[in-house]
Every structure is written in structure tokens, then in C-alpha cells.
Amino acid sequence: ELTYIVDSTAAPVCVLIPISTWAVFASRLLVTNGVTTEGESLKYFIKTIPYNFYAWAALIIVLLLILRVIPPLGRMKVATERVENGGPLAPAGSEKIDIRGNSKNAEPQTHGKMIDFALPIACLILSTILCDVDMQKGVIITLGFMFVLYVSRGLISASDFADCCVEGIKNMLLPLIMMVLAFLFSYASNRIQFTKTIIDTVFPFMQNIPQLMPLFIFIILGITEFITGTNWGLYIIALPIVIPLSAAIGANTLLCISAVLSAGVFGSHICFYSDATIISSSACGCDNFEHGLSQMPYGF
């Protein structure tokens, strides 16, 4: 349930916030495809926010689940009953993808302060920006900063700090492998033009029903996203086709663009091997496949 909440407040929230990377990326594509001008792209993106119905629905449903207006369903119900009966929090096999590793079993430390958490985060943000938004350099600088901050104050020994770094890399290995395989599958789907083939095959039949084009866009692209998990790749492929086609047959271009954005969010949220699904599972210590199955009733 925790993994579902985290996953449902990731991509759905990003596409509703004008300052997110999703907004910047989509706005740039709108300029590239001639929908709006450079200075007006963000304003046009903001117009799509009220019509991004899947993102809104995902947030509303997760809130209703938290408040128990909507009860746990399917595998989530089974998991809830397991925990209530004294069983383990995570399903079997979750330890393989849990990036928290052995930290859950570690002895609690009482001498840490909030500043020990806040300063490294601030250092990571600042160093990444100063290094031309190079996250790799930012992480290396932050690790050095943390070493000085913690070891000099006796919070941790130098050898324990090194052990923590190695253990962290080991815990991230399986999620990273899954991410690489997911990107490989997405790349292969793009190379064979899977999404474009589906669009070219189905969309010509919409010429006589332009009012229903946004609905068909979401359904068709949602299915392809569930299969491929391309997320932003969908926008690159679909928007150059959807925008001129919607204008040509008299469909509402704004609604059609919103439907494309919604389909991308749907794929990021529901696809078993999308980056958001894998990272959410890893962060919460839940088996990726179990998480994907348990959130399906709510996503669909």
C-alpha cells in the first residue's frame, strides 16, 4: 500500500506541476511541433492541466484509499489482512529489490541531528548546480562532504563510512539492472516503431468521429504505454502525429494533447517495468511484480 501511494504521487503529480521536468519537456515539444511559441509554451501546458484526467483521478483514488473510502482490493486486500494478522509487511521476495538493505535491522542511533540530514541534501543540490547540473559530480562531492561532516564529529568511523558506501552500492545493484533492462526494452520498442505503427493503423478511422478522438488517443496510447513503458518516448513519437491530425479532422487539439500526456502518466504509473514503478518498489522495499499487480485495480 505504501508503494502504491508513493507511485501514485510521483508521475501524476509531476504532470500537474508547471515547474516539473515533465512540464518543461512537454512544453518544449509543444514548441517543436508548432502548437505555441517559445515564450507561451508553459502557459499552453498549464491549459492542459485541468484536462489531464488520469493524473487527477490517480491522486483522488489514492486519497480515498488512505481515508478508506475505497477499501483495499485484490492483492492489496490480501496484504492488508496478512499484516493485520501479524504477518510480514512486505511480500516474499521483496528483500531482493529493497534498497534499504540491512539498515532496517541496524541499531538506532540517537546522536544524529536533523542538520546531519539537511546539510548533505543541500550540498547535493548546490554542488550539482555548480557542476553544470552533473549529478555524478554532485554525488561524489556530497559523499566527501558527508565523510568530513560525520567522521570529524565522531558520528561514524572512517571504516564504517566506507562499508556503508559499499553496502549502498550493493543494495542498488538489482534495481539498477532492472532499470537498464527496462530502458533496453523501451529502446527496442522505439526502434521497431511499435507506437507509431499502432497510431498509423488506428487513427485514420477517426476522421468521421473527431469528438471521440481524445478518448481513443488515451485508450490506444495507454495500451501501448502499458506494454512498452516508454513514458517520455511516447510524447516524442505521438505528439508530432496527434497534433496535425487533430487539427486536420477538426478535433479539439488541447484535449488531444492532454490525452497524450495522460497516457504517458498512465504508462509511468501502471507499467511493471517503468522507471517510476521500479524506483517506488525499491524505495519502499516491496517486490516489483507484487506492487504492479496490487495497484492494477486502482490504476485501471
Task: For every predicted segment, state its role.
Residues 1, 17-35, 233-244, 261, ...:
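Re-entrant/interfacial helical elements at transmembrane boundaries that shape
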Residues 1-9, 38-46, 250-255, 284-299:
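Membrane-interface alpha-helices at helix entry/exit sites of multi-pass transporters
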Residues 1-6, 179-180, 209-244, 248-249, ...:
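Hydrophobic alpha-helical transmembrane segments of multi-pass integral membrane proteins
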Residues 3-20, 52-55, 182-190, 224-230, ...:
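Helix-loop-helix module between adjacent transmembrane segments
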Residues 4, 44-47, 160-171, 197-207, ...:
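Short amphipathic alpha-helical coupling elements at transmembrane boundaries
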Residues 36, 41-45, 58-131, 139-164, ...:
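Long, contiguous bundles of hydrophobic transmembrane helices that form the permeation core
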Residues 51-55, 108-120, 137, 166-179, ...:
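Helical membrane-embedded segments and adjacent short helical loop/helix-boundary regions
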Residues 129-152, 159-196, 211-223, 227:
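Core transmembrane alpha-helical segments of multi-pass membrane transporters/permeases
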